[in-house]
Structure formats: structure tokens, C-alpha cells
Amino acid sequence: MRTATVSAGLLLVAVAVTACGAREQAAEPNPPSMQANAPVEPDTSQPVASGNTPAAADIAAVAALNASFDPKRDPVADLETAKVEAMRGGKRIMVDVGGEWCSWCHILDKFVEEDAEIRSFRDAHYVWLKVNYSEENENKPFLSAYPEIKGYPHLFVLDADGKLLHSQFTGELEKGKGYDREKFFAFLKAWAPPEK
């Protein structure tokens, strides 16, 4: 029994010494290689849907397009970002014109966010771009390139190159104090990019 205890003790000491040596080796830095310091560029030719992960900055930029109706945002630059993402993902661009002052804009946001099927369809087929229209910034230079807007929110469907395909007065998609799910979903489906 005493031999087994001594053997077990020696084994524990050997394991501890080996583990400490391994930690010391791991702590020594490896000299950096020139290749490790080279900047990594995201491959924008690959669609996000293919499983490629875009750079974190790309993700943040795309998320910001639909975050709010911000009078300080540049819709021309935002449209360029939306076009890159639309080409990358084989999507269309939905330009949502409105403002934080617009109650129907918030109703539309809530309607889409609370309906998992519509939200999922939107995310799979569209890059959603909010463009502010308010007293602070009417974005006239940008919006002058599109048909007249009759009410807010207003939706413009663009192809991935930014070409206008459709202008949608959202009043036609309303029902009572909200949006008609059947009409709204039919609108999204009608203007989604063709299946490949």
C-alpha cells in the first residue's frame, strides 16, 4: 500500500512539472510573421447567404440602414451600402421614407417586427433602407430622383443596382389602425427578386 501511495505521489509530481513546463512554453510569444499582419479584406463578391461572414463593419453598416429615420444620415451613401449588400445577397432594396414623427412609420415597424414570417421574408429578400423626411432634413436632393410621395411611410422598391421598380403608397396596405397582413405580404412577394 505504501508503494502505491509513493508511486501515485511521484506520478502527480511528474504531471505537475510537465503541466508547468507546457504553460511556460505557451507563454513564450511566437515571432509575428509578415503574413499574419496583412490586412484581411472582406470578399464582397460572395453572397452573405452562401455562409460567408461579412466583416463586422459591414454588418453594422447594413443594420444601421434600418435602425431609424435619422436626419443626420446620408441617404446617397446609405444607398451605396444597400446596393453592395443587395448584390452580395441577391436581394432587392426597399427604401422606406418617413420620420420619427410619423406614427404610421412606427406602426409599420412594429407590424413587421412582430410577424416572424413577414420579418423573415423581408430579411431574406430585401435590404431595408430608411430615409428620413422631416422638418430638420427633407432629403430633397435624394428624394427628387423618385416619384412624388403622397403620404408616409412611403416605400420604393429598387433592384440591386438602385433602379426604381415600384413606388408604393402604404395607405393602400392599411387596414383599420394597422396594416393588412395579406396585402402587405402579397406586396413583398410581388416585388421580391425572382428565385434562381
What does each of the following model-derived ranges do?
Residues 7-18:
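Bacterial N-terminal signal peptides
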Residues 20-24:
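Bacterial signal peptide processing site
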Residues 27-73:
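N-proximal helix/coil linker or "cap" segments that precede and/or mark the start of modular domains
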Residues 51-53, 73-93:
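A short beta-strand-turn-helix
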Residues 73-76, 113, 118-138:
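Thiol-based oxidoreductase modules, predominantly thioredoxin-like and allied folds used
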Residues 89-103:
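Short active-site neighborhood of thiol/selenol oxidoreductases, capturing the structured segment around
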Residues 99-113:
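Conserved redox-active cysteine motifs that mediate thiol-disulfide chemistry
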Residues 150-195:
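Non-catalytic, surface beta->alpha helical segment in thiol-disulfide oxidoreductase systems
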